[in-house]
């Protein structure tokens, strides 16, 4: 630093002592942060300009800074020990401070010797200038080595590089790949991801999978809000919230999602109006011609047809496409949000359980549509068949990290098993090798003739990489209690039932269905066809307009609603919920019941609002099965459940000794459980003899006829 000090003294002989100390301090403490002369000019150039008065212009100040920068670079090896370095991973201070006594006093910090003779006013003025400069700089440089960003209760921190920052700010970064390295994501005091990396290559379709509650939805939100840094030139859309209802027709709402087209059309109308009114100044005609060329380039005239095809594929009839958005229910507005995202075609499309809002027909259409998607997709889904149809890669979230796999979900399962097997083999082989070396060390530790060999073996042990045993995910087990006596049919039936809310719109006409304790019936059909209405008729929650509902006197039905979350008190814990619903039992019984569905330990005592969607579903299952029903009616039970839980639910239903009727859109779950397939359509229910294969073939043929494929 003496050389830099000499440069300052020689170039600015009149420099104030306090300012001199201040500048040399900045140069010393920030030397590792100056990656170019521009950084140094930005840090102290303005201050040196004030010191020089009129004796040096900008070029002169820059020349001085260049000399000091060269000196700092030459001195770099000597100052390396004090330089700032990029951490291997972001550090959580809360984890470090847990090891310290909060009551510890640090006298060196509390009472510091005041030996400085610097003029307080001058120092204050200099520090104010530096603070203003640093604030200005921090606005430009958003890439710091650990930058906490908060989204509701979630936060993220990540390492960054100045090189990427400069490419981004200069506009030279033209890549549409998304690469985020070495980041953490936390939710409250829980670490969801630690030192994780995610790489999304342009044009590939990624399925994000993992157990409930590990942070998949939180990760999507971090990307959507750019709390995890996605390059600014990459457009992204996160289908999370339903479209707000107003008087805009559904089709127009979708068209408006293309902001480029809308801006061009708006400007076209303005220019046309000016020319028609005689207010044109001469340049309007040329601008209008340019706008027409751009509209033709983006095929603006074909946009309404493309939007209509998307809406039709998602189940909107021509009449519905012209309805105001305020007339749609929440589920249909979510479909509308998905349609807008598909129409807008962002560079990165983020989807969180898109199949939850769709029926089987719409899911099959979406599978076909996404297979030709031109840009990048990251989708959270627990629908195995959906991921097999659309995913080119799988990202597995587990153990606070992300592992990437090439291929669809079935390929991922095989690759993961092979990877775990290889990891276990490597771990066991190293353990044997370590043990072999340790035996030698223990045997000859006190043998002077073997001392050098023992030391060599100890160094070998130190150099071995630390391999950890394979972290296997626990198996999910669910069981429906069935300690009841069987009884003879008829168990549950609807006979010649008519039902409607409005006589002008009959939902069912002469409906006749029946089920017994051996039944495993799955109901499918388009949204609005009456699936949930039929379930409520079977439950007895709705009374037929005509016809009869018959239920056995010993029948005890357990009902799972697709809107179960809305029926839970989210301010209480799972244990409190069961205690209120079934009072008078010991807490151990409530905990045991919840444990059957994977809600154990502190999870059972946390407010339901803090649980993931899948965990709330498990609580709803625990509540539903507490009275030991002998028949279950389930409306979309797999929504929000992870794949392992869906598999466990399927096994539990197959082992259950009572009857089951369920509505589902999950193809694998239907194939796992279903013995009968009912299709709701045209005011009635049809039994499909060929099962789901026949139903899928019928839908594919319908798509071909309607031109969707």
Swiss-Prot record:
Post-translational modification Phosphoserine, affected residues: 83, 155, 157, 161, 283
Biased composition (Basic and acidic residues): 129-143, 161-171
Chain positions covered by the region annotation Disordered: 129-171
Record SUPFAM superfamilies: P-loop containing nucleoside triphosphate hydrolases (SSF52540)
Domain ABC transporter: 178-424, 492-707
GO biological process per UniProt: defense response to virus
Binding site residues for ATP 1: 210-217
GO-annotated molecular function: ATP binding; ATP hydrolysis activity; cadherin binding
Keywords of this entry: Acetylation, Antiviral defense, ATP-binding, Nucleotide-binding, Phosphoprotein, Repeat
Source organism superkingdom: Eukaryota
GO CC field: membrane
Entry-annotated residues carrying N-acetylalanine: 2
Pfam families: ABC_tran, ABC_tran_Xtn
Residues reported to bind ATP 2: 525-532
Family: Belongs to the ABC transporter superfamily. ABCF family. EF3 subfamily.
Primary role: Displays an antiviral effect against flaviviruses such as west Nile virus (WNV) in the presence of OAS1B.
Name of this chain's protein: ATP-binding cassette sub-family F member 3
Organism of this sequence: Homo sapiens (Human)
Gene for this chain: ABCF3
